[in-house]
């Protein structure tokens, strides 16, 4: 079964319960609101998208390191010197950290100044991104950044906020 919780907090537990009761033969999960220990208790087929859930649970992921490198190269190529770096929650063990490690490594190597903004764990809705972007922009009011590195929805909300603040994309901020 491919799982989607649609923000229902108990849905993930219900899927695991269905697996334990043999209603389904296996679970492919991209939702990760439960503690990893809940997954470790289950000795049935589980595959995870982009999060480590235990030694015996395979993870399907993308080449995050390459993604971080490509993002760094494009921002450097476009002359960015001060970059806002939106990153996922560091408390969660996930392959996506490789993207951020690689991006930060390259930027440091090139002498580019970065401001890291850690996003909350398991928050993927537009309202949260609007809040996070506004919070960041309010905190960095005097810091003139020229580049942004983040997920698609974060980048879109950043573009909206840049425009609201009477700056131009991509002229002033990339």
Question: Where do the PLM segments sit?
Answer:
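Active-site-adjacent beta->alpha loops and helix N-cap segments on the catalytic face
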Residues: 33-43
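Bacterial carbohydrate/catabolite-sensing allosteric modules
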Residues: 10-23, 41-48, 53-174
